């Protein structure tokens, strides 16, 4: 039985995090650079998704192979997967209620009208609930089959962008709903946890006395591999999330034009550059993965304006490749350059 304080699990977690940091700092940027431009957005999403699924399946196969496919092993595996899925499903169901309460979400008739217009433009086959929340410039999509689909826009965003730019931002969020990103990322987000707990369990089984020496060594090896693989899968899930943001940007561009999407993103980038305390607030939010801008530092500045020259300058701005690898969102400069390539 695993104790409440588990030094083995703690050691494995530290090892996995070190492994993830090394991969993120060395291998990931090179792979991303080599692949960039050679695959379409759809190709990159397909490849990343396949890598996530295959890596997870391979680790599960190794565990079953070494632990022997007995009824107890299969039962444990099914139970573990069911438990992790159930916990994530409960979070998925409860999160809209938590978000509404945490952010003080409130309906807004004018915003609802704009959301309805943009939704019709994008051919959305479902009803969307538009809400305003307090906070610095941001927007996010959330909801589920019980609560319905929400598009939230902060008061700071409403003060920052013009009508056309707001339509682009809303189009981006509706894109997340159209692409079913909440459900897809929930599914993929489960996999690193399953593989990690599988690895920790295998190590504990290997350290037990009930197996032969060779069997113990094999279980230990599979356990360590599984833990390391779970952190690798987490990096792949983050990469997949960044690709889904590009995908949502295409919806924003379709809704209001590439220029409106670029100007909205550039204004957001400029705002957070001018307000580092707001960047920190967003980066510490538990819901940052939902935001349109999440590489971020709480006061909205309604006087932020942007010119085409500034947009071009932001496109060439430097950004941290390491920070990008650990983020759910691509850097704004890369998103602006991506929008340039869209055939719209």
UniProtKB/Swiss-Prot annotation:
Example of a GO biological process term: proteolysis
Pfam families: Peptidase_M48 (PF01435)
Names of required cofactors: Zn(2+)
Assigned GO CC terms: plasma membrane
Cellular location(s): Cell membrane
Main location: membrane
Cofactor binding note: Binds 1 zinc ion per subunit.
EC nos: 3.4.24.-
Annotated keywords: Cell membrane, Hydrolase, Membrane, Metal-binding, Metalloprotease, Protease, Transmembrane, Transmembrane helix, Zinc
Top-level taxon of the source organism: Archaea
Amino acids binding Zn(2+): 172, 176, 245
Active site (catalytic residues): 173
Membrane protein topology class: Multi-pass membrane protein
EC class name: hydrolase
Cited CDD domains: M48B_HtpX_like
PROSITE patterns per the UniProt record, alphabetical: ZINC_PROTEASE
Annotated TM spans: 8-28, 46-66, 74-94, 183-203, 220-240
GO molecular function, one term: zinc ion binding
Stated name of the protein: Protease HtpX homolog
């Amino acid at each position: 039985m695993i104790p409440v304080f588990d030094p083995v699990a703690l050691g494995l977690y530290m090892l996995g995090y070190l492994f993830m940091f090394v991969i993120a700092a060395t291998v990931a940027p090179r792979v991303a650079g080599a692949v960039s431009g050679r695959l379409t957005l759809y190709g990159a999403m397909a490849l990343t998704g396949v890598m996530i699924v295959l890596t997870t399946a391979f680790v599960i196969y190794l565990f079953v192979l070494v632990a022997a496919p007995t009824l107890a092993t299969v039962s444990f595996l099914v139970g573990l997967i069911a438990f992790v899925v159930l916990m994530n499903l409960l979070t998925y169901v409860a999160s809209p209620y938590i978000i509404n309460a945490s952010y003080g979400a409130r309906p807004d008739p004018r915003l609802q009208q704009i959301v309805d217009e943009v939704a019709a433009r994008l051919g959305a086959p479902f009803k969307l609930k538009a809400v305003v929340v307090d906070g610095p410039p941001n927007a996010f999509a959330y909801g589920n089959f019980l609560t319905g689909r929400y598009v939230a826009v902060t008061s700071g965003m409403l003060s920052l962008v013009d009508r056309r730019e707001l339509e682009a931002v809303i189009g981006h969020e509706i894109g997340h709903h159209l692409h079913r990103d909440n459900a897809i990322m929930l599914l993929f987000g489960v996999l690193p946890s399953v593989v990690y707990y599988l690895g920790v369990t295998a190590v504990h089984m290997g350290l037990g006395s009930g197996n032969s020496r060779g069997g113990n060594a094999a279980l230990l090896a599979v356990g360590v591999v599984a833990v390391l693989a779970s952190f690798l899968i987490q990096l792949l899930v983050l990469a997949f999330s960044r690709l889904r943001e590009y995908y949502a940007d295409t919806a924003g561009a379709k809704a209001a034009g590439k220029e409106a999407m670029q100007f909205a993103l550039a204004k957001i980038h400029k705002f957070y550059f001018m307000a580092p305390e707001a960047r920190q607030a967003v980066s510490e939010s538990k819901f940052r993965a939902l935001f349109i801008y999440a590489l971020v530092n709480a006061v909205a500045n309604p006087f932020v304006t942007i010119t085409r020259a500034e947009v071009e300058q932001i496109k060439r701005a430097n950004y941290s490749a390491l920070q990008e690898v650990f983020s759910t969102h691509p850097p704004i400069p890369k998103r602006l350059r991506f929008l340039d390539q869209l055939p719209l």
